[in-house]
Structures are given as C-alpha cells and as structure tokens.
Amino acid sequence: SGSAAESAVSALARRFGTLMGMTALVIGNGEMGRLTAALLRDAGCSVTVTLRSYRHGETVVPAGCSVVQYGERYSAMDGADVIVSATTSPHYTVTRERFAALERPPRAAVDLAIPRDIEPGVSEFTQLYNIDDLGVSCEIDPATLARARAAIDAHMERLHRWDNYR
C-alpha cells in the first residue's frame, strides 16, 4: 500500500513541480488514506481528511491534518488543489455530475481505489490519475495468498456440506 500512496504523491509533485502550499482533500481514512494524507502533509500540503460519522471506535487522523465529514466532501473539494480518494466503497465517492458543478474544481484527482472511487468522466474537468496510470502493482505475498486460498477452501467446504444437507 505504501507504493501506491508514494506513487500518487510523486505523480502530483511531477505534475505541479511542488506541492508546497497546496491544499489537498483525502477521501478515506483507512490505511491507504492515512498514509497518503501524511505524505501530502510532509510534501507541504494543507491536508483535509474525510471521516464517516457512523464509524465507531477511536479515529486516527495524521497529525496536522484537518477533518471534514464524508457527507461534506464536495464542499471541501471545491477550491482544493488536489483530491485523492482511497476507500473501499462499492460506489463512486466522486461523481462526474457533482464534480462538474464545483465552482473551483481541483486541478488534479487521484483514485487509489479498486473498484474505482472517482467516476472516469471527472477526467473531462481535471487531470485524473488511477492505479493503472501510476503503474502500481498489486502483488500479494505467498503467505497471504495461501491464507486466502485456505479461507476460500474452508468456506466452499461448508457451502458444499450445507448444499448436500438440504
């Protein structure tokens, strides 16, 4: 996950020459979002991170970053220089229609999510990068792959037993 966040920040730095003094909105406060927010902060950006109000437990936001509720993300991105979205949402966190309505749309957007967070049509209004553009590989270490396969096999065995029992 570090390589995707680093690639995103590097791509933005190449695009603008520097990120110093720029404003960034990071949508998503999972591991990838927090890492990206911290890297943007370290590059000199003023960073805002979205939070979902229904999540329980302790919320960790990188030091020096401000917070906005997820539902307020469009207000927060209006006037921001860059946005990065890194959620596990099954739907778009940024739609073409809502992005098109912004008075001062961000100059670049980075989508680190699989499946995509940012509707591809957003590219009509700003420079849009996604995981493929950044050349990030999603390699899985053999131990993790073995654990995943074992979990799938166990689940399939339970499913077959249930199906045979019916």
Ranges and model annotations:
Residues 18, 63, 89, 104-105, ...:
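Short, well-ordered coil loops that connect the C-terminus of an alpha-helix to the N-terminus
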Residues 1-86:
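Hydrophobic, well-ordered beta-alpha structural blocks that scaffold small-molecule cofactor pockets
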Residues 37-39, 61, 95-98, 120-123:
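Short amphipathic alpha-helical segments
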Residues 31, 54-55, 89-90, 114-115, ...:
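Short, glycine-/Ser/Thr-/acidic-enriched flexible segments
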